[in-house]
């Protein structure tokens, strides 16, 4: 927290904008953080909206908002409502953090920071190439980080459109051997649909593979469980969320 950040006597609000987010990590995390820091005048809301066009109404109803997190499916759609956007968020085309200062909305992407710092510690020398499952907003920060780390990748989509996208049916033994990192950027397997999982050839996985799931609830998705059963290194998205949340807090409270 910035040393110039002052605890005000009036209410200070933050929130999460998304769809179907009653289970959200953010509200619990920041409510506990406010309690630990004795910020009794701070509150965190879940803004569960069906359509991005409902976003301006949130701002009108809560003029005391100082910062917002943005989650699926609005990380791309939110951009048109912003006054400014960071260079990284502009390059990615997705925003998951908004700082509100003097009624100006400034967009950032802290997913980059969260993913890179959670993903890198388990990288091994043989992890040269990656498979990204999913092509939505969540995959954009992952692609950005992999490019930064000079890790080539292919994108897997149910409905491939671009040249660098392939189908799930294209994932064979040779690809799994060559692309030893597999990152799940789809919501498949998220609570409550915990019996679902991306359809990849898990039987071809072994101890050389590294499976990273952006999902954090449940803590072990079937994607990770099946990978672990075949000897792969696995990691869920909880630490990534914690790291990006702390980054968002620094952005919100910096002068």
Regions found by a protein language model. Give the residues of each.
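Short glycine-rich anion-binding loops that position phosphate/pyrophosphate groups of nucleotides
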Residues: 70-77, 138, 187-190, 217
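Glycine-rich adenosine-cofactor-binding loop
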Residues: 18, 107-112, 119, 123, ...
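Short helix-loop-beta connector
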Residues: 101, 123-129, 205-207
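Rossmann-like adenosine-cofactor binding region
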Residues: 164-235, 239
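Phosphate/diphosphate ligand-binding glycine-rich loop within oxidoreductases
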Residues: 2-122
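Active-site capping/gating segments
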Residues: 117-118, 233-255
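Residues in the short beta-alpha loop(s) of Rossmann-like NAD(P)-binding domains
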Residues: 20, 159-160, 217
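NAD(P)-binding Rossmann-fold cofactor-contacting core
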Residues: 148-165
């Amino acid at each position: 927290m910035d040393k110039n950040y002052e605890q005000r006597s009036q209410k200070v609000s933050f929130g999460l904008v998304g769809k179907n987010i009653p289970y959200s990590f953010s509200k619990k995390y920041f409510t506990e953080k406010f309690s630990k820091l004795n910020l009794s005048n701070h509150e965190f809301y879940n803004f569960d909206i069906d359509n991005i066009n409902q976003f301006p109404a949130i701002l009108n109803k809560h003029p005391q908002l100082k910062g917002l997190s943005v989650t699926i499916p609005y990380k791309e759609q939110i951009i048109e409502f912003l006054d400014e956007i960071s260079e990284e968020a502009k390059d990615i085309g997705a925003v998951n953090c908004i700082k509100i200062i003097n009624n100006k909305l400034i967009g950032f992407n802290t997913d980059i920071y969260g993913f890179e710092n959670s993903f890198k510690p388990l990288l091994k020398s043989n992890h040269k190439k990656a498979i990204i499952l999913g092509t939505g907003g969540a995959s954009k920060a992952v692609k950005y980080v992999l490019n930064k780390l000079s890790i080539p990748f292919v994108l897997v989509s149910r409905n491939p459109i671009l040249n660098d996208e392939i189908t799930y049916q294209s994932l064979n033994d040779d690809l799994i051997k060559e692309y030893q990192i597999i990152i799940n950027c789809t919501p498949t397997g998220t609570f409550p649909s915990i019996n679902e999982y991306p359809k990849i050839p898990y039987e071809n996985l072994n101890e050389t593979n590294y499976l990273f799931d952006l999902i954090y609830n449940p803590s072990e998705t079937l994607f990770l469980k099946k990978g672990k059963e075949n000897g792969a290194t696995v990691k869920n998205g909880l630490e990534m969320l914690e790291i990006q949340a702390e980054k968002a807090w620094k952005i919100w409270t910096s002068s």
